[in-house]
Amino acid sequence: MSGKPPAIFLMGPTAAGKTDLAIELTTVLPCELISVDSALVYRGMDIGSAKPSKEVLAAHPHRLIDILDPAQSYSAAQFRADALEAMAEITARGKIPLLVGGTMLYYKALIDGLADMPAADATVRAELEAQAEALGLAELHRQLAEVDPESAARIHPNDPQRLIRALEVYRVSGESMTAHRRRQFAESRGADAGAGGHLPYTVASLAIAPTDRHILHQRIALRFSQMLEQGFVDEVRSLRARSDLHAGLPSIRAVGYRQVWDYLDGKLTENEMRERGIIATRQLAKRQFTWLRGWPEVHWLDSLACDNLSRTLKYLGAISILS
């Protein structure tokens, strides 16, 4: 192993069983957990985010859960700063940071650093927002596909915040967001060619998912139905009652929350809300798989295997991450 301290990434699509395996690992390894999930950072968003229960969190604390109010935004840059601080504290106590979650952009921000993007431009942003209002998001997505096809392929056509930001970067700088990120990636590898790039840790990357995609789809549908039974609609209703929350916020645009919000707005029937929530979650899982297919040196585990703990320990021993 290199002179860097170890860290473990436990990644995977939604509903794959990441949290259960992470908790198992903490019982046999000197690990402390850091959540890597853009929805779990929000207080009061428990059911729809599949947040671990209060009992689980009390027994197995996770950093970066319940750190923000839903009215606030949280960026990859903020996550990187918070995660690095938590990792340093954990390492200083002789423990191993175990990062668990499915927000792949956050993992990438940790590994590669963040591209030096142009600052927001209020005039350009107002113009793009006016276009979105007048012409629709599909037109903005078409424009983005012309100047930055890679970002267009990655950004959902109904994600106004990311669409507008990608077009804003291009209009302000004359260079696509993809080009900015490629340059930053090259610089990070040049600055530190070791594992982790800008990240001062030796990272073991694990990913867990069912080998049969149909099984994952069944899990997603079952979990969404269970969320509804547990009071997901009432949870969103309480958020909707707040005057400072609206459908344009990143928290409310989270998968599931957006669909239930639309249902409470009368835009969807209950059946439509359920179906669209499941579809949106499946689409999220597909995007997570896309990220993971390009992830270097990732060790895959089958969610359905009964010996994932021993398989994980064997792998970590084989790459000497624990020595």
Swiss-Prot record:
Keyword Transferase: yes
Organism: Pseudomonas putida (strain ATCC 47054 / DSM 6125 / CFBP 8728 / NCIMB 11950 / KT2440)
Subunit structure and binding partners: Monomer.
Catalytic activity: adenosine(37) in tRNA + dimethylallyl diphosphate = N(6)-dimethylallyladenosine(37) in tRNA + diphosphate
Name of the protein: tRNA dimethylallyltransferase
UniProt family annotation: Belongs to the IPP transferase family.
Keywords, alphabetical: ATP-binding, Magnesium, Nucleotide-binding, Transferase, tRNA processing
InterPro entries assigned: Dimethylallyltransferase, IPT, P-loop_NTPase
Cofactor: Mg(2+)
Site description Interaction with substrate tRNA, residues in chain: 103, 125
Gene: miaA
Pfam families: IPPT (PF01715)
Superkingdom of origin organism: Bacteria
